[in-house]
């Protein structure tokens, strides 16, 4: 189009001139039609100046130069005596860009593509570029199966040579696959082959992966899956001959036909390794061993190549080349693999750099490195550093990049690119509950204090039954060897009666200090000491409570509901953690085991031990780690020493968002059985309706008392979160779950209390199922769950919807 205008303009100029081929001298240059473009800018773009002798070639070059600026859609050059007259029509300026009807493509993505093509507010409108964009967008819709889609650019003129640009989308509907045919398959049925496709002509309700909507990219992926399926089963001569995609007349249906040649199955006759093995021939040959008569397997060949690259990478060969060439013998149906290895140069690490850590100090990241500067590059050490950064929980993503140093044949820089997440949480709330009354809660937890890696927490709770404050600090690198030091102090004023638990009041305070010793990359041992003072009062005469007091030599009066008792305890605290999760925040693969325990030491009033074991295992079931199975368990047990019992206030409880969802917090397990007391014969809360003032026998209640043993398990399926863009995919997690748990009292005497539930029976398991959503919000982690209990017992209290701020187990 531009050349056509150029030709016309040249002809006009030629017809308007009366000079010969030798040209004429230009004394002045005048412009007509300039609005937005300054005269000076237009003159600078021209190869002609006043005083120059102008020929036809100069005029043609002038017109080309003015068109090349992109500011004009028409240019004419005329002669008026000794004056060169340039008549132009400026392209209109884009005043605004809007979109309408686009659902599959977001506005931000469209704006990025337009800007990449030079279409933005304030720039000139190039109608040719707009036409190309229209076609490109329509091609995109065709590739995802929307063959009836159309994209039209609507240009609305405005004053001062400006325009509004609006892209109007009519996306239509995606064409659905009516039938997929595979022609030429004999060894495997069509249904078996299609079962591995993402695209399907039939999708059962339970298949959340299959899709009937045609997409060109998915078809390409399915064809590669088909090829791999045959190659992995020995069909070395397998070939996809052709693929036909047919569209129905109404553009709503797709028929796909794939023509294949299976060929025969081939066995591997041997593997020959050649090339530069960098002195590691024995190790490489060990990776290429095959069993006699083993079928050719494309996936195993690829794995073998990658294993060789990883092996060489551990020794500093950062860019090895490994190529496998199959030598196919059709006569005996065998394949001999020729593996050519070129180790390449061995590289040193010049520098290790970090990018994206705007808050975290470099030293916090650098101390997690296992690769050293100045040493040979080890790919396994680089990966260990990445894993350790992920497990810190400070980052949403961690990526590595090995960059060659310009001008150096044997040096690289290792760059860790991180995206930081909010490592702190702040919560403040005022609420009202039927059990707690008016409730105030506030807390600050920062796992990466001022970017130093310190974990600092200040928490407090105030409601009708509890006043609690705690200050905790942990230095994960108390020594350069990675020994951690943590400590806390706390105060707790707790009225169990108002919390719907067994009736007593406990005012406690204490402190503890713990050292953590790294054993290896994945294991840490902990040891520490603690002190706690418990002051118990207003203890109602209750069987489990009185049993503990009797073991302590107190022998309280069963009719007195104002008993008091205090204890000072010193404890040895211990723990072990095994952590091989792929990251500390929203992990998708690996396991974590956490053992915590304590035992009283000489000088304590109580004598007991207590331990808790937590496990979590994540197993991805797809390559992208979007679908993950999570299994969790928690076991707890405690008991007295030397004839004493573990204090009842140390009992285990279950129920709530951190154990068995769908049940009210701490309500699963044994319930309190009260002795009659004179002040409670008035029907005060705590007794069931079966307890009358005239009774002298113990009375059953719905107040939870907990137990000295606990078992909880959960099976969870983590799924992609619907309606969430990729930008927030790492901040939101959705799952469906099945929880189960039980709490029991191993010292409960079912013979002595035959008319009551057997609280020593661990088989009284509660179960629930539901859905949960976790969101890493700017205020910290928020957890929402809805669960329906489907196995419960008398006295249990359901709570289907639960909301929690903070980490769950």
UniProtKB/Swiss-Prot annotation:
InterPro entries assigned to the protein according to its UniProt record, in alphabetical order: Bac_surfAg_D15 (IPR000184), BamA/TamA_POTRA (IPR010827), D15-like (IPR039910), OM_assembly_BamA (IPR023707), POTRA (IPR034746)
Residues in the signal sequence: 1-20
One Gene Ontology CC term in the entry: Bam protein complex
Domain (POTRA) ranges: 24-91, 92-172, 175-263, 266-344, 347-421
GO biological process per UniProt: Gram-negative-bacterium-type cell outer membrane assembly; protein insertion into membrane
Bilayer-spanning residue ranges: none
Keyword Iron-sulfur attributed: no
Domain of life of the organism encoding this protein: Bacteria
UniProt keyword terms in alphabetical order: Cell outer membrane, Membrane, Repeat, Signal, Transmembrane, Transmembrane beta strand
UniProt xrefs under Pfam families: Omp85, POTRA
Cellular compartment(s): Cell outer membrane
Record carries keyword Repeat: yes
Subunit structure: Part of the Bam complex, which is composed of the outer membrane protein BamA, and four lipoproteins BamB, BamC, BamD and BamE.
Family from the record: Belongs to the BamA family.
Purpose of the protein: Part of the outer membrane protein assembly complex, which is involved in assembly and insertion of beta-barrel proteins into the outer membrane. Constitutes, with BamD, the core component of the assembly machinery.
Stated name of the protein: Outer membrane protein assembly factor BamA
Species the sequence originates in: Klebsiella pneumoniae (strain 342)
């Amino acid at each position: 189009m531009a050349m056509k205008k150029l030709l016309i303009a040249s002809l006009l100029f030629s017809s308007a001139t009366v000079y010969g081929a030798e040209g004429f001298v230009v004394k002045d240059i005048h412009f007509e039609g300039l609005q937005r473009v300054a005269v000076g800018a237009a003159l600078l773009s021209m190869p002609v100046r006043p005083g120059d002798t102008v020929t036809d070639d100069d005029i043609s070059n002038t017109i080309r130069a003015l068109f090349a600026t992109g500011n004009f859609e028409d240019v004419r050059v005329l002669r008026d005596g000794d004056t060169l007259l340039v008549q132009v029509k400026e392209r209109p300026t884009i005043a605004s860009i809007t979109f309408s009807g686009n659902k599959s493509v977001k506005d931000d993505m469209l704006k990025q593509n337009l800007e990449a093509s030079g279409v933005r507010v304030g720039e000139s409108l190039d109608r040719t570029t707009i036409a190309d964009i229209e076609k490109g967008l329509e091609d995109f819709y065709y590739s995802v199966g929307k063959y009836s889609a159309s994209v039209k650019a609507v240009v609305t003129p405005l004053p001062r040579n400006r325009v509004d640009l609006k892209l109007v989308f009519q996306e239509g509907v995606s064409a659905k696959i009516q039938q997929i045919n595979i022609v030429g398959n004999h060894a495997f049925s069509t249904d078996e082959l299609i079962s591995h496709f993402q695209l399907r002509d039939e999708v059962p309700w339970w298949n959340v992966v299959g899709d009937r909507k045609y997409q060109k990219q998915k078809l390409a992926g399915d064809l590669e899956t088909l090829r791999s399926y045959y190659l992995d089963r020995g069909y070395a001569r397998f070939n996809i001959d052709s693929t036909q995609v047919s569209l129905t007349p109404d553009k709503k249906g797709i028929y796909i036909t794939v023509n294949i040649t299976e060929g025969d199955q081939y066995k591997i006759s041997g593997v020959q390794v050649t090339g530069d093995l960098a002195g590691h021939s024995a190790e490489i040959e060990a990776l290429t061993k095959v069993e006699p008569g083993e079928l050719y397997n494309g996936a195993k060949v690829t794995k073998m190549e990658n294993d060789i690259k990883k092996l060489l990478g551990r020794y500093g060969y950062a860019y090895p080349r490994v190529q496998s060439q199959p030598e196919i013998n059709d006569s005996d149906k065998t394949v001999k693999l020729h593996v050519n290895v070129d180790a390449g140069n061995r590289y040193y690490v010049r520098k290790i750099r970090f990018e994206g850590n705007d808050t975290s100090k470099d030293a916090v990241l650098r101390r997690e490195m296992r690769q050293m500067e100045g040493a040979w590059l080890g790919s396994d050490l680089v990966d260990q550093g990445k894993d350790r950064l992920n497990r810190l929980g400070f980052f949403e993503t961690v990526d590595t990049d090995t960059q060659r140093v310009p001008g150096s044949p044997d040096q690289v820089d290792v760059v860790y690119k991180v995206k930081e997440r909010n490592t702190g949480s702040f919560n403040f709330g005022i609420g009202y509950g039927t059990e707690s009354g008016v409730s105030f809660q506030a807390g600050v937890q920062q796992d990466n204090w001022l970017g130093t890696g310190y974990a600092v927490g200040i928490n407090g709770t105030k409601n009708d039954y509890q006043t609690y404050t705690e200050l905790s600090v942990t230095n994960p690198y108390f020594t350069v060897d990675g020994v951690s030091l943590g400590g806390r102090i706390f105060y707790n004023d707790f009225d169990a009666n108002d919390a719907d638990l067994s009736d007593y009041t406990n005012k406690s305070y204490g402190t503890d200090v713990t050292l953590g010793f790294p054993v290896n990359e994945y294991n840490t041992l902990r040891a520490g000491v603690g002190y706690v003072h418990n002051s118990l009062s207003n203890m109602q005469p209750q069987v489990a409570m009185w049993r503990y007091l009797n073991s302590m030599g107190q022998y309280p009066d069963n009719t007195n509901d104002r008993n008091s008792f205090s204890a000072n305890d010193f404890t040895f605290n211990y723990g072990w953690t095994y952590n091989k999760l792929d990251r500390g925040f929203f992990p998708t693969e690996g396991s974590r085991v956490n053992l915590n325990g304590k035992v009283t030491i000489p000088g304590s009033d109580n004598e007991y031990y207590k331990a808790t074991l937590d496990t979590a295992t994540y197993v991805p079931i797809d390559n992208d780690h979007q679908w993950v199975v999570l299994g969790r368990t928690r076991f707890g047990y405690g008991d007295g020493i030397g004839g004493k019992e573990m204090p009842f206030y140390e009992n285990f409880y279950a129920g709530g968002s951190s154990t068995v969802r769908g049940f009210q917090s701490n309500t699963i397990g044994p319930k309190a059985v009260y002795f009659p007391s004179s002040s409670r014969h008035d029907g005060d809360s705590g007794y069931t309706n079966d307890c009358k003032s005239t009774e002298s026998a113990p009375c059953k209640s719905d107040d939870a008392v907990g137990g000295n043993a606990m078992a909880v398990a959960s099976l969870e399926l983590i799924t992609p979160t619907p309606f969430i863009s990729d930008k927030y995919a790492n901040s939101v997690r959705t799952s469906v779950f099945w929880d189960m748990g039980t709490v029991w009292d191993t010292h409960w005497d079912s013979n002595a209390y035959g008319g009551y539930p057997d609280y020593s029976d661990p088989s009284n398991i509660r179960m629930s199922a539901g859905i949960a959503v976790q969101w890493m919000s700017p205020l910290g982690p928020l957890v929402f769950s809805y669960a329906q209990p489907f196995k419960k017992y008398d006295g249990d209290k359901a709570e289907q919807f639960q909301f929690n701020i903070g980490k769950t187990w």
